């Protein structure tokens, strides 16, 4: 039984460190070990997410007041850089912890993407190439009928609002392509998606191999339409 915030932090650290020891060989980086270990940094990020500390300035400010739990709190620039470098590991650990907490057992989810523009369209020709180096490019956002330069954040979210998985992809990457890769890592779910995820082949593969049912809102010209009570889910 976890009765306090301190106990929750300890439990989270033990879980994160156990998982990290198993997967850390996949994320080796050059240089000396940091004063704040990767396990500590990942734990601070996960606990901060649980507490709703959405901004890094708020998260780090709170941890600086709790140096009894984490004595070495990195600067914001260093924390941000290391957190981005560990993004894949963070997501793997996050999914494992969610399963341990049994918070993701709803079984019904929604998949969608949202645009993350990084440079205004008309300013792209004169901008530096830094964003392009990190994967940003041009892509269309059909729902808003616009073109952006940047990324799309693809999310798998429980109907209760819990983020189960995410992928930050170039703006040009199709929802169906990224969604297929993301859903292939999950099983035993019913997933609702918009028209961007329509694919009979993908739906069949996920059902056969992952026991995952992908339900999409049909296009108006499709013969098979959803019943009204199910359409309201979208």
Segments (PLM) and residue ranges:
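Short alpha-helical elements
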Residues: 1-234
């Amino acid at each position: 039984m976890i009765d306090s915030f301190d106990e929750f932090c300890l439990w989270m650290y033990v879980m994160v460190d156990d998982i990290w020891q198993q997967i850390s060989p996949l994320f080796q980086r050059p240089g000396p070990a940091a004063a704040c270990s990767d396990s500590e940094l990942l734990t601070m990020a996960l606990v901060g997410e649980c507490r709703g500390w959405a901004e890094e300035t708020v998260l780090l400010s709170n941890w600086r007041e709790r140096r009894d739990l984490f004595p070495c709190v990195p600067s914001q620039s260093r924390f941000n850089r290391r957190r981005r470098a560990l993004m894949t590991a963070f997501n793997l650990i996050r999914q494992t912890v969610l399963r341990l907490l049994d918070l993701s057992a709803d079984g019904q989810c929604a998949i969608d993407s949202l645009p993350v523009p990084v440079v205004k369209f008309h300013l792209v020709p004169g901008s530096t190439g830094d964003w392009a180096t990190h994967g940003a490019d041009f892509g269309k956002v059909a729902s808003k009928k616009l073109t952006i330069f940047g990324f799309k954040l693809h999310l798998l979210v429980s109907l209760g609002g819990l983020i189960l998985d995410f992928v930050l992809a170039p703006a040009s990457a199709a929802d169906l392509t990224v969604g297929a890769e993301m859903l292939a890592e999950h099983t035993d779910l019913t997933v609702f998606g918009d028209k961007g995820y329509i694919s009979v082949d993908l739906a069949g593969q996920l059902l056969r191999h992952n026991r995952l049912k992908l339900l999409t809102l049909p296009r108006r010209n499709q013969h098979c339409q959803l019943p009204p009570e199910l359409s309201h889910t979208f």
